[in-house]
Amino acid sequence: MVAYPEISWTRNGCTVAKYPEISWTRNGCTVSKYPEISWTRNGCTVA
């Protein structure tokens, strides 16, 4: 993981420091910049 210090894995997924608005979770990922879009295990949804 040292090769990618901007990526940090958490208990639920991982976050990318370079893109703080993106956070991966156990079920997919969410983009805080675009809260209406959230990726899930099955694909993605657009609120």
Swiss-Prot record:
It is a lipid-anchor. It is found in: Cell membrane. A lipid is attached at C14, C29, C44 (S-farnesyl cysteine). Keywords: Cell membrane, Lipoprotein, Membrane, Pheromone, Prenylation. It comes from the Eukaryota. Signal peptide: none annotated. One of its GO terms (cellular component) is plasma membrane. One of its GO terms (molecular function) is pheromone activity. The record marks C14, C29, C44 as: Not methylated. Residues 1-3, 15-18, 30-33, 45-47 form a propeptide. Rhodotorucin-A is a mating pheromone in cells of mating type A of Rhodosporidium toruloides. This is Rhodotorucin-A peptides type 3.
